[in-house]
Swiss-Prot record:
Superkingdom classification of source: Bacteria
Biological function: A non-essential component of RNA polymerase (RNAP).
Record field: catalytic activity: RNA(n) + a ribonucleoside 5'-triphosphate = RNA(n+1) + diphosphate
E.C. no: 2.7.7.6
Keywords from the UniProt entry: DNA-directed RNA polymerase, Nucleotidyltransferase, Transcription, Transferase
Organism classification: Bacteria, Bacillati, Bacillota, Bacilli, Bacillales
Oligomer status and interactors: RNAP is composed of a core of 2 alpha, a beta and a beta' subunit. The core is associated with a delta subunit, and at least one of epsilon or omega. When a sigma factor is associated with the core the holoenzyme is formed, which can initiate transcription.
Biological processes per GO annotation: DNA-templated transcription
Family: Belongs to the RNA polymerase subunit epsilon family.
Name the UniProt record assigns to this protein: DNA-directed RNA polymerase subunit epsilon
Length: 71
């Protein structure tokens, strides 16, 4: 399944909406997403599963690139 992860680049600062970034990752579950990203030291705000029409919509975005992290 593909997940969209909303995150801040640093853990040390208070989250600011304007600095929120996103990435797409393939994983089995939200827990699996967190496990795969744990070494990146980012502040994960929200993990959203993507499927069906929502996934098709996101795939139209030119910035849509799925991270494939093996762990």
């Amino acid at each position: 399944m593909i997940f969209k992860v909303f995150y801040q680049e640093t853990i040390d600062e208070v989250p600011v909406r304007e600095k929120t970034k996103t990435l797409y990752i393939e994983a089995e579950s939200e827990r699996d997403v967190r496990r795969k990203l744990q070494d990146r030291h980012i502040n994960i705000e929200y993990i959203q599963p993507l499927e069906g029409a929502h996934l098709a919509y996101e795939q139209q975005n030119p910035d849509f690139h799925v991270l494939e992290i093996e762990q």
